[in-house]
């Protein structure tokens, strides 16, 4: 499969580029605003994996939707207007979106939901996180997912 990786200069971008190569995928574009990276992807792209920055997601997914290219989003911190543009594109192309793709986190989401259900409304639930001071999205996508999972369990 020919994929474009957006946010290729970032932590996850580097991991994804390496993993794609190990899995025999053809990374046809390594897109990032950092010098030395592609600025967009070409017509031969069959899928886009986006770990860029929230403000870049809407224009990128709209380009993919116009070209009929499936889209995976790992970028977090989207504003409501940005998310609504993603949702509109998801009606036209396959879109997979998560704030965290880790198996452990997704199991934890399920456990938090069940714990909230078991504890009931007599207990307060609080999500507390700690991260480096340069984190771009705070609260993190994972913290928001945990809070939503707890709320849904009520």
Per-region residue spans from a language model:
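Short, acidic/turn-prone active-site loops that include or flank metal/cofactor-
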Residues: 33-36, 76-79, 100-101
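Active-site-lining helix/loop region of Rossmann-like oxidoreductase modules
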Residues: 1-19, 28, 116-154
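Rossmann-fold NAD(P)-binding glycine/threonine-rich loop
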Residues: 61-62, 66-67, 75-96, 106-115
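Short, well-ordered secondary-structure micro-motifs
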Residues: 40, 84, 108, 137-141
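Short glycine-rich or small-residue beta-strand-to-loop segments that form or flank ligand, phosphate
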Residues: 2, 72, 94-102, 127-133
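Alpha-helical scaffold segments in soluble metabolic enzymes
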Residues: 15, 19, 47, 59, ...
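Short, well-ordered coil/turn residues at beta-beta hairpins
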Residues: 51, 74-75
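N-terminal glycine-/serine-/threonine-rich beta1-alpha1-beta2 phosphate-ribose binding loop
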Residues: 1-67
């Amino acid at each position: 499969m020919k994929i474009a990786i957006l946010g290729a200069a970032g932590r996850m971008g580097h991991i994804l580029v390496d993993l794609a190569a190990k899995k025999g995928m053809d990374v046809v574009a390594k897109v990032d605003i950092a010098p030395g990276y592609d600025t967009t992807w070409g017509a031969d792209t069959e899928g886009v994996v986006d770990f860029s920055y929230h403000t870049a997601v809407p224009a990128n997914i709209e380009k993919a939707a116009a070209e009929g290219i499936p889209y995976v989003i790992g970028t977090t911190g989207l504003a409501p207007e940005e998310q609504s543009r993603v949702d509109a594109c998801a009606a036209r192309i396959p879109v997979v979106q998560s704030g965290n793709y880790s198996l452990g986190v997704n199991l934890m989401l399920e456990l938090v939901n069940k714990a909230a259900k078991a504890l009931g409304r007599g207990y307060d639930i609080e999500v507390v996180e700690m991260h480096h001071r340069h984190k771009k999205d705070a609260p993190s996508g994972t913290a928001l997912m945990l809070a939503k999972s707890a709320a849904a369990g009520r």
